[in-house]
Curated annotation (Swiss-Prot):
Stored SMART domains: RNA_pol_Rpb6
Coiled-coil positions: none
Family as reported in the entry's similarity comment: Belongs to the RNA polymerase subunit omega family.
Name recorded for this polypeptide: DNA-directed RNA polymerase subunit omega
GO BP term, pick one: DNA-templated transcription
Gene source species: Idiomarina loihiensis (strain ATCC BAA-735 / DSM 15497 / L2-TR)
One GO location term (cellular component): DNA-directed RNA polymerase complex
Origin organism lineage: Bacteria, Pseudomonadati, Pseudomonadota, Gammaproteobacteria, Alteromonadales
Job of this protein: Promotes RNA polymerase assembly. Latches the N- and C-terminal regions of the beta' subunit thereby facilitating its interaction with the beta and alpha subunits.
GO MF annotations in UniProt: DNA binding; DNA-directed RNA polymerase activity
Amino acid sequence: MARVTVEDAVDRVGNRFDLILLASRRARQLANGKEPLVETKNEKPTVIALREIEQGLIDNERLDIEDQAAQKQQDAEELRAVDALRGIE
C-alpha cells in the first residue's frame, strides 16, 4: 500500500479542505481515463492525484482550463450532431 504524506500538498494548496476538493477532482479525471502527469506504480487515482499536486503539476487553475476546453469540445460535437439531424429532415 502506498503511503502519501500530504503536508507538502497542503502547503501548495493552502488548506486541507481545498486539497480534498482538488485531489478528488483530479482523481476523478484519472479514474475516467486522463493520463497521469507522474510516473505511476500501480497506484490508485487518489494517490496519483496527491503526488501530482505535491509536485506542483496540478492546481485548480489548470483543472479549470482543462474542464473549459473539454466543455467547448463537447458543445461543438453536440452542435455538429444537431446540424446533422437538421440535414436529415
